[in-house]
């Protein structure tokens, strides 16, 4: 295969395949940011919200004390697993206000997310198919920026997955000269 001179990536731009994946990833990252803040446009039938309310009442949980973890347990118990990614939205419907980020913080997070694409491609294990977990990445970027008030709101990975992702994240941080903070 020959590269036509114009198709050669310059030192300023990553190869086209990285750009393509980065474009898809940044859109997914923005979607995760929206879900996290319950800004998503999703429809959850009223009867599902009512069933969740009944379960909360049955378990004698005060709504202000409803955690993401407990909400996930309730969804699982009710067979509503497909709504896991909408937990913040569901809690908002129950009267629990979601965490809100400033537009400036969102923009900063998106820019940092774009910054990690080339180092990720460089250090990604060859047997790895997917990108880093998006909530893990959002957690690490907020941690890096000192935005610790958001950290308790992110669903975290199981221990082994954290270790695997931390190994890649450490290499990315080293490459970008960012502080690496171990997750465990």
Identify the meaning behind each predicted range.
Residues 1-184:
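Non-catalytic, interaction-prone regions of core transcription and DNA-replication machinery
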